[in-house]
Amino acid sequence: MEAIAKHQFARVSAQKGRLVADQIRGLPVEKALDILAYSPKAAAGLIKKVLESAIANAEHNEGADIDELKVSRVFLDEGPTMKRIKPRAKGRADRIFKRTSHITVVVSDS
C-alpha cells in the first residue's frame, strides 16, 4: 500500500531541497518528522508539510497504521524558473533566477 503527496511549484531550488530529501529517504515517518522539525534548512519545512499530507492520505484513503509507515520514496524535480532583472551600475542588468521545484513524497507500509 502506497500513499502519495505532492507540492508543485515550491519556491525552493531542487538542488537545495534534495539535500534535505536525502536525509529522510527510507526512514520510518516518526523519525523523518523529527529530523525535518529540527533541520535549519528552509526546504525542510516544505518537505515536512508534504510528508504530513502523505501520512494523512495513507491513514484516510488506505486505512494504514501510521506506526508502520516508512518514507519509501522522496524526490524533488525541477520546476519552472522565474527570471527577474536586477539593475546594476552604468545601465547594465543582472539576471536573477528564482527557481522552483516539485516535491513528491511516497509513504508505504512495506
Swiss-Prot record:
Pfam families with a match to the protein in the record: Ribosomal_L22
CDD domains referenced in this protein's UniProt entry, alphabetically: Ribosomal_L22
GO annotation, biological process: translation
Segment forming the signal sequence: none
SUPFAM superfamilies from the UniProt entry: Ribosomal protein L22
UniProt xrefs under InterPro entries: Ribosomal_uL22 (IPR001063), Ribosomal_uL22_bac/chlpt-type (IPR005727), Ribosomal_uL22_bac/org-type (IPR047867), Ribosomal_uL22_CS (IPR018260), Ribosomal_uL22_sf (IPR036394)
Keyword annotations: Ribonucleoprotein, Ribosomal protein, RNA-binding, rRNA-binding
GO MF term set: rRNA binding; structural constituent of ribosome
Taxonomy, superkingdom: Bacteria
One cellular component (GO) term of this entry: cytosolic large ribosomal subunit
Assembly information from the UniProt record: Part of the 50S ribosomal subunit.
UniProt similarity note: Belongs to the universal ribosomal protein uL22 family.
Stated role: This protein binds specifically to 23S rRNA; its binding is stimulated by other ribosomal proteins, e.g. L4, L17, and L20. It is important during the early stages of 50S assembly. It makes multiple contacts with different domains of the 23S rRNA in the assembled 50S subunit and ribosome.
NCBIfam families: rplV_bact
Protein name: Large ribosomal subunit protein uL22
Organism expressing this protein natively: Idiomarina loihiensis (strain ATCC BAA-735 / DSM 15497 / L2-TR)
Gene: rplV
